[in-house]
């Protein structure tokens, strides 16, 4: 009970009447007292909740753990400051609440295989499958005690078994490997007394009811699941396990869908007919729908979906009323004489490392208190962005702040020019758990077709949760028109945008991705800033190159702030940040926990921390700013550096081994191509100076806040604690 008048209402009515006649001084006094009473009661209630691990505050978890003998893993790193958001997030990884809550139960189940899977999930947050490798050894059967399911030889006719070779689900016998699985050098797997914990670090994200992309270059019957038109492997929507003792199988883990399991093997098809899709995957992880003239979807039944290898688009042609699907590449082929007339909608799961770049995940939404929200979608009165902009323009009285919110994961193809009046605020954002795509087409032959934004004094523009492909985003000062040449800068003034925020968005590097994963326009920037002083903020986003053009270098440089993002210029030799002419950008850069692929040429770096620069960095003003706990390639010209690589290894290496050490600590990624699941993920062979080189011993780069080194160290320590005596247990990264 937190009512402000709780004490005043306890007074007899006669005193309240007298108090009202005198203007309510007694009521005001009791409201002040009630406020303090409420604070004390809430504190008492919070103290009671702190007695239980399920309801206690995060700072109480270590104390409850100490009461039951829980010991933190010091190899994972020291706890952070709980008063700061970064330290608070780190402490939740170092001392997981779920592990503390279940530690007594773990001790009772010590030595069981299923416990190792629970440990992986509760300690590190990674789904896992535990495997005992001695069961997969090939050996001679004893005549007295034959075990027909063990010790077999490899069956080269078993295509399904060979398809699983090397994975966590293989049943193919192996010869013995004498190397230990937890060796610090080269690891082995198949040995007596060896168990492995296969962990899946990539998270799966859903895409619901989005249009498939028609690849007209290959044929009007060829489609991709990805709305941008490139290959995307489909992933399993992991099903919960049925019991605590159950060992996870392929349906319980966020693993990529392979072609063989995607086919239904429970029922034999008629002679000469292919197998249709399995109920384990279709409808649950994947679905395809055809739309009618009115846009109403009709789902294709799984009996009409044929799993196929479509690495060659024209290799397989489905029969009439059927559709071929390749889950490995994310491709769809319809019969050539039965093409979709009104569109195709698909739902599927894809994988990525973290919640960045937009998608169907929860994120924090914000807007001004006075903002008016215009909802756009195929089922809404406003169908397009232009309809929403016109509704805002014609609104009487016109709101100073507007939010255009996309209510579905539709693809919007519009030509947009936004011009904000003084003090106006406009936000284009996706609704929660939606993934809209804005595809900018080549409408005009004589002019560029980027998403163009101008604004006057005090105006603000925000993008949140969108994927933009086909063209880039151009922010331009109000003093020049979009038709003007960049060779004729106007006089700087205050008549300009105040700030631009790009949050949880993807501005596709190279504008769009071809079917083979290569960018279509690798030399074109995703973000152009022409003659504007707007403060640009980029948060949890993926962008291509950034180009700027300044009015007059006698004024202050344009501020750009980048956090938890990827800036991808396609290769380390191209410019990730530079002027439109390829010279030094007149920019004051602040960057944290980000990965930059490409060269950076900027006027100043005020602060760069926990960041990977994959290309040479050139800063004009070296006497101002700092670069700390980052990777900066040799040959870079930066402000003073602190605890950066390869500077640290050069200081400690022998003179003859300097170059060897410099090459050793160079960041290695699993993939640097946008659209792949392991995009910008540090590889297992990457040097520890990079994977634990941040200021809190986490990894450098965009995935710093995942705290993967701390998760892995915690899990290794718990494996040593709960593995049966005489056995070796190790971690194997499945992706």
Language-model segments: residues:
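Compositionally biased, low-complexity/repeat regions
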Residues: 1-371
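C-terminal, active-site-flanking charged/polar segments
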Residues: 128, 324, 328-329, 336-354, ...
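Surface beta-loop-beta hairpin patches that serve as ligand-binding interfaces in beta-rich domains
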Residues: 339-362, 643-735
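Right-handed parallel beta-helix/beta-solenoid
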Residues: 355-394
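Right-handed parallel beta-helix
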Residues: 460-465, 499-511, 533-547, 557-572, ...
């Amino acid at each position: 009970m937190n009512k402000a008048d709780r004490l005043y209402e306890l007074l007899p009515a006669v005193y309240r009447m007298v108090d009202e006649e005198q203007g309510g001084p007694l009521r005001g006094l009791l409201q002040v007292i009630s406020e303090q009473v409420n604070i004390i009661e809430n504190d008492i209630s919070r103290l009671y909740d702190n007695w239980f691990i399920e309801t206690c505050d995060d700072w109480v978890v270590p104390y409850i753990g100490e009461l039951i003998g829980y010991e933190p893993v010091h190899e994972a790193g020291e706890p952070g400051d709980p008063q700061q958001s970064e330290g608070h997030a780190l402490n939740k990884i170092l001392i997981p609440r779920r592990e503390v809550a279940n530690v007594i139960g773990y001790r009772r189940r010590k030595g069981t295989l299923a416990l190792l899977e629970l440990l992986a999930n509760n300690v590190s947050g990674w789904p896992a499958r535990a495997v005992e490798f001695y069961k997969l050894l090939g050996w001679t059967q004893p005549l007295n005690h034959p075990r027909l399911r063990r010790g077999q030889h490899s069956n080269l006719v078993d295509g399904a078994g060979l398809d699983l070779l090397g994975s966590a689900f293989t049943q193919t016998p192996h010869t013995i490997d004498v190397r230990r699985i937890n060796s610090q050098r080269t690891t082995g797997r198949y040995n007596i007394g060896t168990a492995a914990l296969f962990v899946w670090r990539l998270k799966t994200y859903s895409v619901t009811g989005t249009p498939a992309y028609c690849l007209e270059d290959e044929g009007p019957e060829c489609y991709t699941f990805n709305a941008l038109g490139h290959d995307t492997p489909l992933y399993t929507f992991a099903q919960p396990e049925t019991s605590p003792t159950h060992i996870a199988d392929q349906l319980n883990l966020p693993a990529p869908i392979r072609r063989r399991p995607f086919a239904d093997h429970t029922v034999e098809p008629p002679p000469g007919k292919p197998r249709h899709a399995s109920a384990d995957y279709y409808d649950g992880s994947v679905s395809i729908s055809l739309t009618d003239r009115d846009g109403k979807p009709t789902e294709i039944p799984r009996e009409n979906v044929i799993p196929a290898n479509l690495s060659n688009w024209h290799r397989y042609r489905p029969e009439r009323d059927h559709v071929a699907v390749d889950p490995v590449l994310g491709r769809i082929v319809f019969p050539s004489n039965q093409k979709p007339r009104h569109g195709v909608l698909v739902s599927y799961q894809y994988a990525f490392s973290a919640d960045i770049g937009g998608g169907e995940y929860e994120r924090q939404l914000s807007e001004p208190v006075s903002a008016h929200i215009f909802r756009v979608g195929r089922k809404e009165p406003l169908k397009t962005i232009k309809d929403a902009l016109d509704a805002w323009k014609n609104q009487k009285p016109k709101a100073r702040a507007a939010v255009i919110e996309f209510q579905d994961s539709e693809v919007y193809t519009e030509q947009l020019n936004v011009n904000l009046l003084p003090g106006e605020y406009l936000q284009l954002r996706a609704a929660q758990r939606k993934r809209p795509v804005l595809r900018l087409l080549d409408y005009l032959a004589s002019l560029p077709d980027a998403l163009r934004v101008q604004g006057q004094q005090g105006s603000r523009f925000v993008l949140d949760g969108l994927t933009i492909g086909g063209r880039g985003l151009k922010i331009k000062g109000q003093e020049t028109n979009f038709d003007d040449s960049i060779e004729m800068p106007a006089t700087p003034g205050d008549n300009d945008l105040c700030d631009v925020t790009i949050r949880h968005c993807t501005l596709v590097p190279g504008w769009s991705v071809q079917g083979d994963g290569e960018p279509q326009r690798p030399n074109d920037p995703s973000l152009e800033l022409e003659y504007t002083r707007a403060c640009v903020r980029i948060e949890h986003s993926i962008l291509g190159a950034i180009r700027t053009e300044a009015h007059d270098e006698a004024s202050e440089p344009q501020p750009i702030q980048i956090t938890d993002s990827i800036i991808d210029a396609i290769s380390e030799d191209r410019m990730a940040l530079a002027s439109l002419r390829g010279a030094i950008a007149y920019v004051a850069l602040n960057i944290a926990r980000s990965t930059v692929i490409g060269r950076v040429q900027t006027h100043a770096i005020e602060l760069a921390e926990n960041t990977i620069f994959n290309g040479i960095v050139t800063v004009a003003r070296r006497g101002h700013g700092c670069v700390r706990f980052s990777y900066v390639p040799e040959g870079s010209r930066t402000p003073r550096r602190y605890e950066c690589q390869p500077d640290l290894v050069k200081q400690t290496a022998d003179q003859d081994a300097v170059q060897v050490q410099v090459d050793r600590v160079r960041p290695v990624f699993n993939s640097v191509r946008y659209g792949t699941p392991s995009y910008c993920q540090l590889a297992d062979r990457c040097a520890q100076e990079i994977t634990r080189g941040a200021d809190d011993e986490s990894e450098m780069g965009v995935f710093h806040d995942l705290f993967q080194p701390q998760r892995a160290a915690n899990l290794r320590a718990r494996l040593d604690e709960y593995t049966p005596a005489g056995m070796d247990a190790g971690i194997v990264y499945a992706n």
